[in-house]
Amino acid sequence: MIRTDAKDGALVLFSGGQDSATCVAWALERYQTVETLGFDYGQRHRVELECREGVRDALKHRFPAWAGRLGDDHMIDLSVLGAISDTAMTRTIEIETTANGLPNTFVPGRNLLFMTIAAAIAYRRGLRVLVGGMCETDFSGYPDCRDDTMKALQVALNLGMDTRIVLETPLMWLDKAQTWQLAEQLGGDALVELIRVETHTCYVGERAELHDWGFGCGECPACKLRKRGYEAYLKGERVTEAPL
């Protein structure tokens, strides 16, 4: 049984994808009040934003114990981020590795901006906990997904706002198979199926074909990782190496 911090409310960064949907469920099991926050930054796969409402509605209707805890949703226009980012996440270009070793899907400063804005909203809403789906196990090397980055950001935000906000990253040390397993632990097969069908991960925004592991093109790094993680989860295995 996961403990509940009744006195604390949480704001979850919720994109509409697998990881953030799992984080919403994690927070709903843990906190009495959970609000969600999404960002429209001109992402190529903005279909994920269209999935958010369906996921929230499904969580309310299929999990009665969580229905009363799921609070307001916030959507922020961050089109300026897309305007200054020449990446495969915001442009229709081929996904490849750049000279610095990072994939060109990396959007510089994205998670730093996300968490800063989230902290400002949480401060205003009286919420003490921020929850993000950052992960340093199955990831593409994004520096703003690292544990050290999140810890440093927590310090900076608390100093800058003279508060005591806590940044929670429940997926930080989980691989994708373990993320699927966490969903099962939180909400059983019903939550796994909700995440499989209702969330979106594919970088190119393909949502025409439903695979065993969910919708997607099946070829981009995000789809390959989700597919491998789901297959390993079904077999009870771990996935520790992200695909190229």
Curated annotation (Swiss-Prot):
Q: Which GO terms describe its biological process?
A: queuosine biosynthetic process
Is Nucleotidyltransferase among this UniProt entry's keywords?
Answer: no
Instruction: Please tell me whether the keyword Nucleotidyltransferase is annotated for this protein.
Output: no
List the pathway annotation.
Answer: Purine metabolism; 7-cyano-7-deazaguanine biosynthesis
For molecular function, the Gene Ontology terms on record are: ATP binding; ligase activity, forming carbon-nitrogen bonds; zinc ion binding
Q: In which domain of life is the source organism classified?
A: Bacteria
Name the enzyme group at the top EC level: ligase
Q: What cofactor does this one take?
A: Zn(2+)
Q: Name the catalysed reactions.
A: 7-carboxy-7-deazaguanine + NH4(+) + ATP = 7-cyano-7-deazaguanine + ADP + phosphate + H2O + H(+)
This enzyme's EC code(s): 6.3.4.20
Residues binding Zn(2+) are C202, C217, C220, C223
- Residue sites binding ATP per the record: F14, S15, G16, G17, Q18, D19, S20, A21, T22, C23, V24
Reported function: Catalyzes the ATP-dependent conversion of 7-carboxy-7-deazaguanine (CDG) to 7-cyano-7-deazaguanine (preQ(0)).
Entry's NCBIfam families?
7-cyano-7-deazaguanine synthase QueC
Question: What is the name of this protein?
Answer: 7-cyano-7-deazaguanine synthase
Record organism? Burkholderia ambifaria (strain MC40-6)
